[in-house]
């Protein structure tokens, strides 16, 4: 475990322990993962490296580790990570996967990036994602698609596909992601890794390029629940001066309750998550996971989330509406792409946005502008907000009967790249099980629980009540202590 050939098979917790014991250096570790990431560039997971910055951070971590004599160093000191390119970073490009921001370099770091850096994380680079985090297949990036390491002809999921693929391929031990309607959980499921979206407001959105401001949330992606707990502890905390939606709650140690028994835990199983449209292979893997949780002492409770089907139209009204507002700032005036030739200011706006945005982003801007327009606001946007409240109420009714909700992450395993053709509805329908929790602002996570057709990974989704991340991580950790699915590795990596 102390040789460079095995470094990429270590979890964050294992690697951090070796670094603190000085059995491996941060510099050696950074060089090893940089070499792996660059050697597997065809995966499409990375968008940018800055080797000078990465190695400088690693050397600084080694000096801090050498100077420590009382064990007071940050837990993650020297651990390498990369960030989804939706977080702005001072020393790396910040493109949001869009031609609109091609080559853009931010003058500051996102709060999540700063918090992880304060805990000693070494930044390896920036990771590919769907343009402005809009997509379920990571095919919408202006810089090319990401490939699933389990089958290079298939999607890794989206929009945090680069993060999920890089972790699954052992190009790095962990990565940041963002989740608006399932963009951490779905790619985690498709790539066989563990990922968690915390309660809305747990992690600061400052420095996250905004898609839908009432839904966007940052979270970690790693191979184990223990690693996610370590990372989430570092990422969360109040940021009142820079993010008004940040919760005024102190940072929490999510590792503290990982090993608690789940004996007697009530796990709600929503009937609506197991109906028509759920593939048999996914159903079998999820059913197997639920039976394993029963063996660990949990009790399965049938519940209902009656407005599950409404989550798709509600989400695809609210999220595009917020996107149309947020993306109005990209007009070619102050930063980002600007059309080379134009007749006047209005023409410059039109050509800049036509050239800079991809098809899916344009589609959502148009939908959002339409539902916010005079005469349609009440009929669409206001109505969607009312139903959103009802969806949140459905969850609160369910939690009167259970402690945690469990079900599939997606109706199918990862599909072929280009498999949905030019049918955006097919991508939208793939989010049906992740959207309800997102609309309610609840924490949710995905953990690998088996394989479906063509030996593609399947994830189990856990959804907790507000601020119950520790409970989700506890359930996931106990499951992973009893099973081996999270240890599976794609061939060739």
From Swiss-Prot:
Coiled coil: none annotated. Disulfide bonds: none annotated. Pfam families: Amidase (PF01425). It comes from the Bacteria. Its EC number is 6.3.5.7. GO terms for cellular component: glutamyl-tRNA(Gln) amidotransferase complex. It is an enzyme of class 6 (ligase). InterPro entries: Amidase, Amidase_CS, Amidase_dom, AS_sf, GatA, LisH. It catalyses: L-glutamyl-tRNA(Gln) + L-glutamine + ATP + H2O = L-glutaminyl-tRNA(Gln) + L-glutamate + ADP + phosphate + H(+). PROSITE patterns: AMIDASES (PS00571). GO terms for molecular function: ATP binding; glutaminyl-tRNA synthase (glutamine-hydrolyzing) activity. The active site is at residues 84, 159, 183. Allows the formation of correctly charged Gln-tRNA(Gln) through the transamidation of misacylated Glu-tRNA(Gln) in organisms which lack glutaminyl-tRNA synthetase. The reaction takes place in the presence of glutamine and ATP through an activated gamma-phospho-Glu-tRNA(Gln). Belongs to the amidase family. GatA subfamily. Heterotrimer of A, B and C subunits. This is Glutamyl-tRNA(Gln) amidotransferase subunit A. It comes from Albidiferax ferrireducens (strain ATCC BAA-621 / DSM 15236 / T118).
């Amino acid at each position: 475990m102390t040789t460079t050939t095995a470094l990429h098979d270590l979890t964050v917790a294992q690697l951090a322990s070796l670094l603190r014991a000085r059995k491996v250096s941060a510099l050696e570790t950074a060089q090893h993962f940089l070499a792996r990431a660059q050697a597997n560039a065809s995966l499409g997971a990375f968008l940018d490296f800055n080797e000078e910055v990465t190695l400088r951070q690693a050397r600084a971590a080694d000096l801090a580790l050498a100077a420590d004599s009382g064990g007071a160093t940050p837990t993650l000191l020297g651990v390498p990570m990369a960030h989804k390119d939706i977080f702005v970073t001072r020393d790396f490009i910040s493109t949001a996967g869009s031609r609109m921001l091609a080559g853009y370099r931010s003058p500051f770091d996102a709060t999540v990036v700063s918090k992880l850096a304060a805990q000693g994380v070494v930044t390896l680079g920036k990771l590919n994602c769907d343009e402005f985090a809009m997509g379920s297949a990571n095919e919408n990036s202006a810089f090319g698609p990401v490939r699933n390491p389990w089958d290079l002809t298939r999607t890794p999921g989206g929009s945090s596909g680069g993060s999920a693929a890089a972790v699954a391929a052992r190009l790095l031990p962990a990565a940041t992601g963002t989740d608006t309607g399932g963009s951490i959980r779905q790619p985690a499921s498709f790539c066989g890794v563990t990922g968690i979206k915390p309660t809305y407001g747990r992690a600061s959105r400052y420095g996250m390029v905004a898609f839908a401001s009432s839904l966007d949330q940052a979270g970690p992606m790693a191979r184990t629940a223990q690693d996610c707990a370590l990372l989430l502890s570092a990422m969360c905390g109040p940021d009142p001066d820079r993010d008004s939606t940040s919760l005024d709650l102190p940072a929490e140690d999510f590792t503290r309750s990982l090993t608690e028994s789940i004996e007697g835990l009530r796990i709600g199983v929503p009937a609506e998550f197991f109906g028509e449209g759920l593939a048999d292979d996914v159903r079998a893997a999820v059913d197997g996971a639920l039976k394993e949780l029963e063996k660990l002492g949990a009790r399965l409770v049938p519940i209902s989330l009656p407005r599950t089907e409404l989550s798709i139209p509600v989400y695809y009204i609210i999220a595009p509406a917020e996107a149309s507002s947020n993306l109005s700032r990209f007009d070619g005036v102050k930063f980002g792409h600007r059309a080379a030739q134009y007749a006047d200011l209005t023409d410059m706006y039109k050509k800049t946005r036509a050239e800079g945005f991809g098809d899916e982003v344009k589609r959502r801007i148009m939908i959002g502008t339409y539902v916010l327009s005079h005469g349609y606001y009440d009929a669409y946007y206001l109505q969607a907000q009312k139903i959103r409240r009802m969806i949140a109420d459905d969850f609160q009714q369910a939690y009167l009967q259970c402690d945690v909700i469990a079900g599939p992450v997606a109706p199918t395993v990862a599909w072929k790249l280009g498999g949905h053709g030019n049918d955006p509805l097919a991508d939208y329908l793939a989010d049906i099980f992740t959207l309800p929790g997102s609309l309610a602002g609840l924490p949710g996570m995905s953990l690998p629980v088996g394989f479906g057709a063509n030996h593609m990974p399947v994830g189990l989704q856990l959804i907790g009540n507000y601020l119950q991340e520790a409970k989700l991580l506890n359930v996931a950790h106990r499951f992973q202590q009893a099973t081996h699915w999270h240890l599976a590795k794609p061939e060739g990596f």
